[in-house]
Amino acid sequence: AILFYFTLLLAVGATAQPHYYELRPDIPPVYNYNSDSLYKKLTGLKDIELSEKVQMDYAASLAYYHERMLHSGYIYFEWSELEDYVNSLVKKIATSIQSEKEFKVYLVRSEDVNASAQDNGIIYIYIGLLAEIKDEAALISVLAHEISHAIHSDTKKNFIAYSRQSKR
């Protein structure tokens, strides 16, 4: 509990002043995420719900979004204690529901109270959300919610709906 409140105190301090970000060409190796391999993996899957064009667009959009997040300066690369803690909670949740999907949490430098998940197991947790969380149980609830989005392929479902709607 002390670690949790100390972490939240640091998170609140992290959001107290505006940040100015610049593109980061020097992403630490542990964060390297090969967007090309993600794109190939996603386009190689045969999905009866998606036409080949929509599937390629979907794969490209996921890969592009993550690449943009990594290079934007919005991802914390130097806060390993908090990242390890949140990833350990995600691992416990995934193990408890017997999920075979691998998850990775990225901490986002933003005051927004938000979190999001991609179907490929990437979860973005915004520091503004962590600053508002009252205890570990609340954080676990948010993480479980995001894991459910990834498991149920909600990103893909939204992309399909958007693709169909934009054709009208």
Positions of PLM-derived features:
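Bacterial N-terminal signal peptides
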Residues: 2-11
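Sec/Tat signal peptide C-region and signal peptidase I cleavage site
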Residues: 12-16
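Peri-catalytic and regulatory segments of divalent metal-dependent proteins
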Residues: 18-168
